[in-house]
Amino acid sequence: MLITVYCVRRDLTEVTFSLQVNPDFELSNFRVLCELESGVPAEEAQIVYMEQLLTDDHCSLGSYGLKDGDMVVLLQKDNVGPRPPGRAPNHPRTDFTGSGSAVPGTSSSRHPHPHQHHHHQHQRIPSTQQAHGLASGENMAFAQDLNSPALIRSMLLSNPHDLSLLKERNPALAEALLSGNLETFSQVLVEQQRERAMREQEMFRLYSADPFDQETQARIEEEIRQQNIEENMNIAMEEAPESFGQVAMLYINCKVNGHPLKAFVDSGAQMTIMSQACAERCNIMRLVDRRWAGVAKGVGTQRIMGRVHLAQIQIEGDFLQCSFSILEEQPMDILLGLDMLRRHQCSIDLKKNVLVIGTTGSQTHFLPEGELPLCAKLLSGAVQEDSSDKEVAGSIKHPVKGPGRKKH
C-alpha cells in the first residue's frame, strides 16, 4: 500500500514523500524508512494518524487501520539529549547562490528499500503561520538560530560538499567565508539576503501592477528571461558540469635551433609567431627582416618586429621548414599558426590527444597540464593569463603591416 508522509522537522521545514509498504510492516521499521527520506532520526520521529499518536513500535501499520492512499504526519521531537555521533542538524535554507536560487540538498543518495518505492519528494520552507500550531517557543528560537551567520558559517566549514557548491555558485560569499573573518562573512551574507528580499518585493509589485501596462510587461518579460537563464545554468550544472571547467590549451614539445621549446598549437591564428625573448635564446634574431615590421591588430595590438623567412623546427624526429613573425611582447615562446599547420598538412586528433604531421606521418602528444608553461597552467590567475594568450592569438589573425609593406 502507498502511504504519504507529511514531515515537519524541528526547524519547521517541511517535506512530503510517499512510501510503498506492506500492511504487516512494523511501526519501528516504518520510522527507519522515514528517516532515510526526511533525515529525522527514527528515535525522534512521532507518527500521527487520524489525530492519534502511534506509540507501539511492534504493531503493524495495518493494525492501526492504515490503508492504501492514507496520509500520516511525522513530527520531530524537541531536542531532549545529545545527538548521536555523525548526525548534524538540518542546514538552514539560505540563498547560497547569490541569485535567489537555493543550493541543492546535501543529503546522501538514498538507496531503495525492498519494501518501498519513492514516488515523489517536495521540500519548502513554511512560515510560522503555516506550521499548523506546531511551532513552540523552542522551535521558534531554533529557527531563528539557523539564520545566525555564525551558525551558517560553521555549518559550511564543516561540510565539504556545501563548501564546494558555494565556491562554484557564489564565489563572493565563499571568499568571505574562507577569509576567516566572521564580520566580513556576515556583511556579505546579510547584503545578499537583503538583495534577495528586494527582488522578491519587486516581483510582488510587478505581478500586482496593471497587467496591460507596457513597462510592466517589459519588466516581467525580462524577469522571465532571467529565470530561464538561471534555470538553464542550473540544468547545465547538474547534467554537464564539465562545461564549467577550464580546458588546458594545446601545447607540444619542439626544438628550434637545438633549443627545447613548448609550442602553442592554434589553428585559429593566421601565422606562426615567436616572442623576441625566445628568438634571442634561439639565436635567430640576426635573421629578422625588419622590412616586415608592422602592427598586429585583433582583440588587442602587438608590435611585429619583423619576420624570419625560413627556419627549421624539430617535432619529434622530423625537421620541418617554418617561418616566424617576431612579436615584441607576448607570454608564449612560440605559437604554431595555420600557415605552418597547412604547409605540413597537420591535423589535431583530440581523441588520441596528438598532433599528426601529415607530410611525414609522425605524431606528437599534446602536453598534460603539469608540463605546460607557467602562462598556460590552470591556476588561480588562469583567466587573466588565458586572456593574454587569447589577445595575442587574436592579434595575429588580422595583421596590419607597416606602410608600403607587402602582405603575405
UniProtKB/Swiss-Prot annotation:
Ubiquitin-like domain: residues covered: 1-81
CDD domains: RP_DDI (cd05479), Ubl_Ddi1_like (cd01796)
Organism for this UniProt entry: Rattus norvegicus
Residues forming the catalytic site: D266
Protein name as annotated: Protein DDI1 homolog 1
Assigned EC number: 3.4.23.-
A molecular-function term among this protein's GO annotations: aspartic-type endopeptidase activity
Job of this protein: Probable aspartic protease. Seems to act as a proteasomal shuttle which links the proteasome and replication fork proteins like RTF2. Required, with DDI2, for cellular survival following replication stress. Together or redudantly with DDI2, removes RTF2 from stalled forks to allow cell cycle progression after replication stress and maintains genome integrity.
InterPro entries in the cross-refs: DDI1_N, Peptidase_aspartic_DDI1-type, Peptidase_aspartic_dom_sf, Ubiquitin-like_dom, Ubiquitin-like_domsf
Keyword DNA-binding part of the UniProt annotation: no
UniProt feature, compositional bias: Basic residues: 110-123, 398-408
Any one biological process term the GO annotation gives: proteasomal protein catabolic process
Comp. bias intervals (Polar residues): 96-109
Pfam families in alphabetical order: Asp_protease, Ddi2_HDD, ubiquitin
Similarity section: Belongs to the DDI1 family.
Region described as Disordered: spans on this chain: 77-135, 386-408
Keyword set, alphabetical order: Aspartyl protease, Hydrolase, Protease
Source superkingdom: Eukaryota
